Amino acid sequence: MRTLAGLWLDRASRTTLQEQLARGVKELIQSGVLAPGDELPSTRDVATGLHVSRNTAVNAYDRLVSEGFLEPVSRSGVFVSSSITLSPHSTWPAPRAPRARPAAPPPLVREPLGSPAPFRPSQPDVSLFPLLVWNRMRSRALKIEGRSLLHYQAPCVAGLPALRQNVAAYLRDSRGVRCDWHQVVITSGSQQGLFLLASLLLGRGERVYVEDPGYVEARLAFQRSGARVVPGPVDEQGLCPPARGAKVSLVYTTPSRQFPTGVSLSLARRLALIDYAGRNGAWIVEDDYDSELRYGAPPLPSLQSLDGSGRVIYVGTFSKLLFPSLRLGYVVVPESLLESFVGLKHLMDDHLPLVDQAALALFLESGAFYSHIRRCRKAYAERQGLFLKLLREADFPLEFPVADGGMNLTGLLPAKADDAVWSRRLAAAGFDVPALSRYAVRPTRPGLVFGFTAFAPPVLRAAVGRLRRVLETRV
C-alpha cells in the first residue's frame, strides 16, 4: 500500500479541506507518484494522519471515485483506477499552464517544534553546537557592521559577499569544488535551491532522472515545474546512470550519501553520469548531502570537481551540520546560468537574514566551523557504532547494510513485510521511523529509516529498549 507522501493541508486557505485532499491525491496520480493499481491508505488512516474528520476523507475519496481516478474493491480497499491513461508529455493536465494558476502547497510534512522523536532521520544533535561561540560571532558581526546589517541590502540578493567567499574556500578545500566566490549563491536551505533550479531549467513535459528511492521533496519540486520524473534504480554503487538512448534534461543525485539508502556513488558511476550529461546536454544537480559525515575512508571527489563541461550544479546546506533552524544553504551556479538564477531568486526574496549570514561567515573564517564538524564526526561515529551494536544484541528482524558515515541507517525488512504498517506501529509508540517505501516511486524492498545522530548514548539505549518491546511481534 502506498502512502500519500505527507500530503499537507492548509487550514488558513479558503479552499475546503475536502477539496484540498481530493486535489492533492489527484496531483499525486497525475504526476506518477501514485500509479494505476496502487492501493491508497484507508480513510481512517488518512483522517488520523492529516487531522481531519473521517467524513472529509470519505467525501474526498468518493469524489475521486466519481471522477474515475479511484476505484473501490470490495473487502480490499481503494485503488488508483487501472483504466487511467495519462499523457506521456504532460504532468499536470490542467486547462491552464502551471505558471498561470496559483500553486497549491506541496505535500510536505509539518514537524512539531521541540526535540525530535526517537530515530527521526537527518537530525543533528544541537546540544553539540557551540552556542556561546555562535553568539559571540553574532555580536562581533553587529559590532563590525553596525546597523547596516539591519537594513535592506540591494546588492545581497546572492548573499553577503563575505559569506560567499568563505563558502567558496570551504568547498574548494573540503570537496574540491572549482568555482569563483561570485558563483556561490546563498539560499534558505537546499530546498529553495532545488525549487529555483527546477523553475529555471525545466519546462512542462521535460524529463528528470531521479534516484528511486530518493529525496521526496526534490521530486516534488521537479514535478511542480511541470517536469516528468523518471525514477532511476539505486544499487550498492548508487544511482544507475540513464540508459544510453534515454533523453533526460536533468539528473538529480545525492552521491556522497544517497538518501535514504546511505550508499555512496562509485567513481565509475560518477564518471558515467558526467559523460552522459556532456553527450546529451543534460544538467546534473549534485546535492552533496552528508558529505562531511564520513567515519572511515575520505569521501570520493565531488561530481562538480570531476566535471570539465560546466554541466554540474552543486547544492548544499548548513542546517544538517549546524542546527536545523539555520535556514542557510548554497548553490554553486555555472557561469552560464548565474545571471538568470540570481534574477529568479530576486523574485522570491531580496536577501536572507544578514546577521546570520555575517555570523556564519565569521564562524567559518575563525575555524570554529571546522572544530564543530570534527566534534560531530567523532560523536556521530560513536553513536552509529553503539546503535548497530544494540540492534545486533536485540536480534531485530532487520538487515542493515554496511555504512561508514551519515546521519541515518536503513534497516531492510523481510520481503513480505509491509513497512508502512510497521512505520505506523512505531509512530503510535512515539517513534519517528519512516518506511523506505515512502521515498520510492516503484515497489522496493520494505525497510525502515532510522536516524541516530541527534540522540546521546543514554537516549539511544533507552530508545532501542522501547523499540525492542514494540518489535517483539513477529514481522
Task: Label the predicted regions.
Residues M1-L142, S336, V342, H346-P353, ...:
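N-terminal basic, amphipathic alpha-helical segments
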Residues R75, S305-S340, V355:
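Active-site PLP attachment segment
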Residues P124, P255-F259, K320, F455:
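Short glycine-rich anion-binding loops that position phosphate/pyrophosphate groups of nucleotides
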